Amino acid sequence: GQWDELYYFLVIEELQRRQMYQSELDEELERAYHVLAEKFVSSDYTRFGKMLLDGFHNVRPGGRYVDFEVPDLEGNKVRLSDIIKGKIAVIDLWASWCMPCRAKAKAMIPIYEKYKDRGFEIVGVAREFKNTDRLKQAIKLDGYPWLQLVELDDGCRIWTQYMLGNAGGGVFLVDRDGKILAVNPKPGEVQKILEQK
């Protein structure tokens, strides 16, 4: 009844809070979600809760990256897996207003230039709000030579899927099979892995 639905809302709120603050997931909370998901199969809570749980379980070293489709700067839809399949890749989730994100990305430019012809790819995905004006300025100023995609107004909930909450961004190094090798690796770590592969 309505109490179950209210309880479901509270379970989802708690999952989201833990994701936002990058807290641990406990079995009891996950069990409560699964019981309620069976009861409310077609609920938006069920879909959102699954997205949150997938992030908890997958987005870590040894897990698999979460695929998505978002537009590039010209508005063409691009599926991430189409770009990085069979390559060692960095998925750079960033924002024009996140200066630490931009500094990390700029530090990757020499590595990208050195290894881009050897099966290495970087894909930037910028979390922007309202428009892409500041994003275009940042790309021009910082000189990123790789593909940039746009997550506008959290339309695809990529930050939620990647367990980033309200953070400006995150960097994910994945292998040729889509397995996450490192989260927020330093440029030296990326280069070391590329030299070994």
Question: What residues fall within each predicted segment?
Answer:
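Structural microenvironment flanking redox-active thiols in thiol-disulfide oxidoreductases
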Residues: 103-142, 154-160
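Generic structural signal for well-ordered beta-strand positions
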Residues: 78-79, 181
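Hydrophobic beta-strand anchors of alpha/beta hydrolase catalytic cores
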Residues: 90-91, 122, 171
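Short active-site neighborhood of thiol/selenol oxidoreductases, capturing the structured segment around
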Residues: 79-102, 108
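Thiol/disulfide oxidoreductase modules built on the thioredoxin-like
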Residues: 142-144, 151-196
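Short, small/polar residue-rich loop motifs at catalytic or cofactor-binding pockets
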Residues: 64, 87, 166-168
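Oxidative protein folding and maturation machinery
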Residues: 1-78
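Conserved beta-strand scaffold positions in the cores of enzyme catalytic domains, especially
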Residues: 122, 148-149
